Amino acid sequence: MRKRFFQIATVSIITCMTLTSCTSRNNNISSSYNEKEKKFKIGIVMGKTEIHDKGFNQAVWDGIKKTGEKHNWKEKKNYVKTDAPSDKDAKKELTKYAKKKYDLIFGIGYSFQKAIAEIASKERKSDFVIVDGIVEKPNVVSITYREEQSAFLAGIAAAMNTKTHKIGFVGGTKDPFIKRFEYGFKAGVMSVDPKIKVKTKFANTFDKPEEGSKLAKSLYGEDVDIIFQVAGKTGLGVFTEAKKLKKSGKKVWVIGVDRDQYKEGLPENVTLTSAIKRIDKGVDEVITKKLKGNFQGGRILRWGIKENGVGLSKNKKNLNKDTVKQVNLYQANIRTGHIDVPENKKDFDNFSPVKPEKGEIKKKKVKIGK
């Protein structure tokens, strides 16, 4: 009996010691994480387009702020933004953050590819992120989106709402990421009616609204009644021209990009819909993994419809029921892979409209990127 008592007592003491040790270790891990979280610093380098461009740059900034709020971070303390109008400026700013040992350094946009590739090779102990670009380096994560898929849905919506059978596309520049929008959009229009004409114009700039107005005026003057703008701050000029025409009694529409641009069409109400990217999701995932010590350098993340990373805006005020039904049907078919949206000229030239399969298609959990 006495022997049995000592056995039980010994087991109890060992168990208690083990639990105390585990609790202490967990507390230490939690304390270490909290300390790291408080001191975490992010450097963000943007191009010459303003942060409040009401489009891509603002979508990125809003995503970083959203993550910051989750961690009680303060602007200028935990996350800092600087502008880099030129490639030389970009390299200088990226290097500055690396030398100051910032935890993550973001370069925003396709134009930062060369600068990040060069600085990441020199500053190998620093971790970099490029949004809307690809840099294949072991200390760089590339966040990209399947823009062609959301653009395809925008094409479906445009084709179902045009009265003139003439639709416009205004791009900022002819880089591969903007061309994805163009080819996806044209494929969507073609899937509804191959006879509809899509007229394309490029501004060769992302920061001149007056150029956007000029191109929009030209397209609307050619009997185009819907324009899909993918031109950053330049695209705001498309809204300006559309609102001007709406005031004069002409019914025209604009399709926004990257974030819900419904407000940009007010008060004249000219935003048909917007092709959005969930930039906040991509940004949050990379920051969270870095915080947990799991920065996945070398990965190229691709967010598409399957990953709930792109689509049309939730605001459907200006889309009729038939349009919403068709958009949802095509979206479901892209999700399952029944419809493969073209993202370049070669794919587009070989694209043939596919009749969507009907019926409810369940969402599946998937891994993002490679």
Give the positions of each predicted feature.
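C-terminal motif of bacterial Sec signal peptides marking the signal peptidase cleavage site
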Residues: 17-21
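A residue-level marker of the well-folded mature domains of exported/periplasmic proteins
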Residues: 24-370
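Bacterial N-terminal signal peptides that target proteins for export
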Residues: 1-9
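Serine/threonine-biased, Pro/acidic-interspersed low-complexity stretches characteristic
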Residues: 9, 22-23
